[in-house]
């Protein structure tokens, strides 16, 4: 016969009180319409649900379950913005709209989480933007990709500008995700068309040429400029402060207005430097009529004020972005900065290469590079403006680079001299070394 020894906790008044209550049954199953109704009552403008097992969310599954192991369904929540605020050439107005809409969205997601809890369901709402898991920086700091979830939930399609375009509200939306511990009965009708109208205004408006007409996207160009006053730009500013000999050199590196702008972002939430691509987008049922009824007027009142705006544009020296702004926007002021993407591991270096690759310096030649750094291997092929990164060593290399991973990372970030690293046998480089110089120009720092 088993003797049950009472736990000290069993004598606690709260435990005793709960023991006397009738245990509640399982909560009622949730339907799509019920979730939508709760979301709208919380203040959402639209809402969709998608299973965490959806094939398009494979990359999201692990980080979502790490944050909320009970997650089974993701609820995508939409709050719309006021287009005229976002379009204003006074970018402080646009940034205030981003901040206000984002703040409202976090409140909506939190309220929805509370409503679901009242029905007996566990739910969690990560921030629509910040705070993030900065201990993981410069790796993945976000818990869930709100954009990816929204597309999988049939709330829109990804545009050329890499923002979700909602069929009704267009690009003027902010997104959040609520994680839910239950399956939801019912799914939204598939979105059968792309809300993008292929006007390419986002391509023409981007000051750094991050959006290419063929669908390509220069990630680093967007990050270096538009997100200048976020994590990486702030770090770059600190390095300028440390490296400057005196206040006069600091002023040569960082203007008074740039210092004030960074202070403003630190004090009143970070501000975007552009977001012109969203501002000029005419897509969406509620937005498109203005463009269709008066295209010249739309270009005159919305597009041209942003394109002709005198503003600093932050670019890495030798980058495609620098060449673009000098050729396309001579009225704008080029400001040189360090690359925002700096790898802290060999695997991170391999993953980041497609994000920082510059097509301009890669045109007109080709080469195959083998990397073997602390046992981490990769094959990199550059051919007339294109890049291919493969794990492992494949084919015949024109150049082989091997040795200590940290030494290579120090060379890439400018902390060490490559020649000295080779002389000290920290690195080994074999093959056509002239290609190494060409390789470096494709990844300016």
PLM feature segments, named:
Residues 82-84, 172, 185, 288, ...:
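Short, acidic Gly/Pro/Ser/Thr-rich loop/turn segments
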Residues 65-70, 165-172, 393:
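Short glycine/proline-enriched loop/turn "hinge" motifs that connect secondary-structure elements
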Residues 41-46, 121, 360-362:
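Short secondary-structure junctions
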Residues 85-87, 174, 188-189, 290-291, ...:
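Short helix/loop capping segments that flank catalytic or ligand/cofactor-binding pockets
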Residues 302-303, 308-445:
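Feature captures hydrophobic
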Residues 58, 94-95, 100-285, 293-301:
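Catalytic cores of enzyme domains
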Residues 74-76, 175-177, 280, 370, ...:
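Conserved hydrophobic/aromatic beta-strand scaffold that supports enzyme active sites
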Residues 2-106, 110:
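Non-catalytic, usually N-terminal nucleic-acid engagement modules in DNA/RNA processing proteins
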């Amino acid at each position: 016969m088993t003797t049950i020894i009472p736990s000290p906790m069993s004598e606690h008044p709260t435990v005793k009180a709960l023991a006397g209550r009738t245990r509640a049954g399982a909560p009622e199953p949730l339907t799509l319409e019920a979730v939508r109704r709760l979301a709208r009552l919380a203040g959402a403008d639209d809402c969709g649900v998608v299973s965490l097992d959806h094939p398009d969310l494979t990359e999201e599954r692990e980080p979502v379950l790490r944050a909320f192991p009970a997650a089974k369904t993701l609820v995508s929540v939409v709050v719309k913005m006021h287009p005229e605020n976002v379009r204003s050439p006074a970018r402080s107005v646009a940034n205030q709209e981003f901040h206000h809409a984002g703040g409202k969205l976090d409140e909506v997601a939190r309220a929805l989480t509370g409503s679901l809890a009242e029905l007996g369901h566990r739910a969690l709402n990560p921030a629509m933007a910040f705070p993030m898991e900065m201990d993981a920086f410069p790796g993945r700091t976000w818990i869930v990709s709100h954009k990816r979830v929204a597309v999988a939930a049939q709330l829109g399609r990804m545009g050329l500008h890499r923002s979700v375009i909602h069929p009704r509200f267009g690009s003027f939306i902010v997104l959040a995700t609520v994680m839910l511990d239950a399956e939801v009965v019912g799914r939204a009708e598939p979105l059968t068309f792309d809300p993008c109208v292929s006007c390419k205004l986002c391509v023409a408006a981007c000051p750094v040429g991050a959006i290419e007409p063929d669908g390509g996207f220069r990630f680093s160009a967007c990050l270096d400029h538009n997100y200048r006053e976020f994590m990486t730009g702030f770090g770059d500013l600190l390095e300028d402060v440390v490296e400057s000999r005196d206040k006069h050199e600091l002023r040569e590196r960082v203007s008074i207005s740039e210092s004030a702008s960074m202070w403003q972002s630190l004090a009143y939430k970070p501000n975007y430097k552009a977001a012109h691509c969203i501002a000029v987008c005419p897509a969406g049922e509620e937005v498109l009529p203005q463009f269709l009824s008066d295209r010249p007027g739309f270009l005159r009142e919305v597009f041209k004020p942003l394109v002709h705006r005198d503003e600093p544009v932050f670019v890495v020296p030798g980058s495609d972005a620098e060449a673009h702004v000098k050729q396309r926007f001579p009225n704008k002021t080029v400001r040189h900065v360090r690359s925002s993407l700096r790898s802290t591991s060999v695997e991170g270096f391999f993953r980041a290469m497609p994000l920082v690759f510059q097509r301009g310096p890669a045109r007109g030649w080709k080469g195959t590079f083998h990397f073997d750094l602390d046992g981490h291997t990769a094959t990199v092929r550059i051919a007339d403006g294109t890049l291919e990164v493969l794990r492992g060593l494949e084919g015949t290399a024109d150049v082989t680079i091997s040795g200590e991973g940290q030494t290579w990372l120090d060379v890439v970030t400018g902390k060490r001299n490559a020649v000295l690293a080779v002389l000290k046998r920290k690195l080994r480089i074999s093959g056509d070394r002239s290609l190494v110089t060409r390789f470096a120009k494709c990844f300016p720092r």
